[in-house]
Amino acid sequence: FAIHTARKRLLGIENIKPFVVQNLGKYERQVWQAAEFGDNAEPVLRAYRGFMLDLYHADILEGYVWLHGVKAGRMVHVGTVDSPVVRADVTHMIAEFRRAIGAGSAARVKGIDVLGWDFALDMQETVKQEAAAAGVDVKFIRIPREVLEKKAVDQGDIRFFELAALAVEVRGVKRDVTVELSDFMVPRDDVPQDVIHAVKHWADWIDYWAIDFNYRDDTFHNEWQSYRTRRDRALQLSVTHAYHEPGDYTVVIKVIDILGNDTTKAVPVKVR
């Protein structure tokens, strides 16, 4: 939250020069894991997963590689601290899920809860749909940074939120491309009731959003953004960008909601 607030304040400075927000979370998590559970690879991984499953109120499941726990009739996968959850991971989970059905503790599972620190692009839309087509209900759930804080863990102040779903309309006229947010759906199971009651329109969930109009599978470049401030609560929901050259581009939209979670969506664009 502090980093997000600092970014908005920097953007509010007139004639501010370009800057980069470096995400060092992976290294921080690696240090935390070593401090909490030690350096011996396999025991550390088991202890880490057990810790996460306990926070998630899930039971440990033995005998599987990609499925680590069971909660309320659903399997649970715990992502590692240093790698995002990607499509191939989900493919392995589904294959193991099918082999596990009808065996022991996994006899009545309904789907898979995938806990992760980071997720590859379009997991909530594309990969979730692919899993559904394969007959498996998959939920992607972000591991909150608060698990790194002993005080928050001891007080039980840990909330796991499912990834939101972002709907975007992209329209092109020659070299002008308009990107418009059309919906933002936040799963409400674990959202505080006072927050839910305060939201009157889907856009109320959004605090900040930005666009990289030419994403090249590397770093997200903040080429345009709209965000709320204390004085100005208005949020622009569409923008038009003019490309200098025709070609195939990937537009990436990043949204940060009022809960502090980020959602990213990639859209292919053909400019004539």
Predicted regions, residues:
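S-adenosyl-L-methionine-dependent nucleic acid methyltransferase catalytic domains
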Residues: F1-R272
